[in-house]
Amino acid sequence: SYSDSIEKYNNSIRDLWKPEFENALESTENTNVKFMNFCFHVNQGESPVWFFGMNPSLPISPKEIISQDSDLTENLIGKLKEEQKNMHDEYQYFKKAKDFFKDDVGINELLNPIFHDLYPIRHTKQNEFERFIKDKSLGPLRESLDKATKHLIDKIMPDIIVIANAGASRLIKEIFFEGIDSNSTTLTYEQNGKKTDMIFSSMLSGQRALDTYSRSRLAREIRETWNSRNNK
């Protein structure tokens, strides 16, 4: 089930966090990524559509600061999850994505996308984060995080995954479509007799938000994919 799958995912993130991330920070150079709040996948209820980002931003004034010395107790994990739920309601990133599915896509079944970040490491400047995650001296951290997300999707196999930006799109293709050199905006991932349609966007939100034409085109692509899956 969705709940069981995200519990396993969150446990894997918790277990690798201290040893692997600490080692990654020690081995990489020229990076401003720091050991601070990371991000669990909070239970959002089941939905046929998921919305993938690269990594979560760091709140200006987070309620809980996680350091290398923090003890990840169940109480602290609960506080982190609660803060994330509040962010889903309050942050423009999530509001704009929900508005897009409501106003532009306009399909009742797709009004509540499930948000998931490929890398649950809080850092606001994505160009800095991309340099960090692609650093060849990173060690096993990226591979472990890639596997955690892939195992999660293999278990859930949602109907549609919309990838929010170009950076995340490139990395998702490496994880799920290794060896495929494709500039296609849609690819179908197959596993265990099920199919997930992945739709790659250049930039749905953030500073370089999609222009009106690109939003319309992405919304149309999502509708066409949904209707094709449901023989409409």
Regions found by a protein language model. Name each.
Residues 1-89, 148-152, 189-191, 228-232:
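Active-site and ligand/interface coordination hotspots across diverse enzymes
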Residues 55-59, 119-123, 166-170, 203-207:
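Short, solvent-exposed loop/turn segments at secondary-structure junctions
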Residues 72-120:
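Low-complexity, serine/threonine/proline-enriched polar segments
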Residues 114-143:
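Charged, often glycine-rich, active-site loop that binds/positions anionic groups
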